[in-house]
């Protein structure tokens, strides 16, 4: 079939489209490996529209990789708070220290992949963007594009199919401009070959696409049923004191993985208890990638708190390293004068 025989034409059309109509105004479109690496980590599982502001704040706080390496974990987590998938921030900090110690950024895909938090697809992106290495990105957008081009009937969330997609991606990637090609594939998935409303009539490689020719692009990609998400119920303690006419909230620094809340390691959270005694004042549900967390919040006295608890004035909560659902919860509860 044509899409097997003419990969050069496929890549040429993609890159031509990307240069003319792709996303050109993103702040990390530069040869600076620090910006590229920072953006690729932030873009894992997160949309461009969300990443923009966080990216700008990180660059303002940590203009270079050395600045990031020298920062405290608390400062890194504080700036990351709200972006989610918090292990990314911890790995980012660890990787910054490794890069700073080495005195340079990785020069190959294999070297990129050795950094904490850098998987195969991210390493391919960075190697192609920063080093010009012929390496194919195969992230979620690219997998969807390839599944439609080849009309793959096998579920893409199975390991065998993932390997096949990676092989197809490596076969198609441009040998002359792999960075442009990878960006084009990601842009195509984000802008035209979207999950629910593919714009096949605008696609620069539509004639190569089997699903488009069949007239059924929405039938692809095929996915096997996902495993049910685990659930966890956590009882948290809310203790508020009034000092100098300002409420102070007692918090703890999460320093361990517990009850499926590993994503919050390194952040400020409410103290927890296995045996709540106070009145329940709030209950929230928060869906994470691996677990649906129900947080039951109980009023408590200082004497009930763990030894490592500390009090923070309400005015510091906005800029503190709190998970987004905890920050939102506290902003609501602290305005309820009937609680205190």
List the predicted regions and their residue ranges.
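Intrinsically disordered, low-complexity, charged terminal extensions of DNA damage-control enzymes
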Residues: 1-24, 29, 187-340
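Catalytic cores of DNA base-excision repair glycosylases
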Residues: 4-8, 16-201, 205-214, 218
């Amino acid at each position: 079939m044509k899409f097997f025989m003419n990969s050069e034409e496929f890549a040429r059309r993609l890159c031509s489209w990307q240069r003319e109509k792709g996303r050109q105004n993103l702040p990390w479109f530069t040869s600076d490996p620090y910006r590229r690496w920072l953006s690729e980590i932030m873009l894992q599982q997160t949309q461009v529209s969300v990443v923009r502001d966080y990216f700008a704040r990180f660059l303002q706080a940590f203009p270079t990789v050395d600045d990031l390496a020298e920062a405290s974990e608390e400062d890194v987590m504080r700036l990351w708070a709200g972006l989610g998938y918090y292990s990314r921030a911890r790995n980012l900090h660890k990787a910054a220290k490794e890069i700073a110690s080495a005195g340079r950024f990785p020069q190959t895909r294999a070297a990129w992949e050795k950094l904490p938090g850098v998987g195969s697809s991210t390493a391919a992106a960075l190697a192609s963007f920063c080093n010009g290495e012929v390496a194919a990105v195969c992230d979620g957008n690219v997998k969807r594009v390839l599944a439609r081009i080849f009309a793959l009937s096998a579920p893409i969330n199975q390991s065998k199919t993932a390997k096949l997609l990676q092989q197809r991606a490596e076969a198609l990637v441009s040998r002359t401009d792999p960075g442009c090609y990878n960006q084009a594939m990601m842009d195509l998935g984000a802008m035209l070959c979207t999950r629910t409303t593919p714009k096949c009539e605008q696609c620069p490689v539509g004639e190569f696409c089997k699903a488009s020719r069949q007239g059924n692009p929405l039938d692809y990609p095929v996915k096997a049923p996902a495993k049910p998400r685990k659930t966890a119920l956590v009882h948290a303690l809310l203790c508020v004191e009034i000092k100098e006419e300002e409420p102070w909230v007692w918090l703890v620094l999460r320093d361990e993985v517990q009850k499926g809340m590993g994503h919050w390691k390194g952040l400020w959270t409410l103290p927890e208890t296995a045996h709540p005694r106070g009145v329940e004042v709030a209950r929230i549900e928060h869906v994470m990638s691996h677990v649906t967390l129900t947080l039951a919040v109980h009023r408590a006295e200082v004497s009930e708190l763990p030894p490592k608890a500390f009090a923070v004035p309400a005015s510091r909560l906005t800029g503190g390293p709190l998970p987004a659902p905890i920050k939102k919860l506290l902003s609501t509860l602290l305005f309820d004068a009937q609680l205190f």
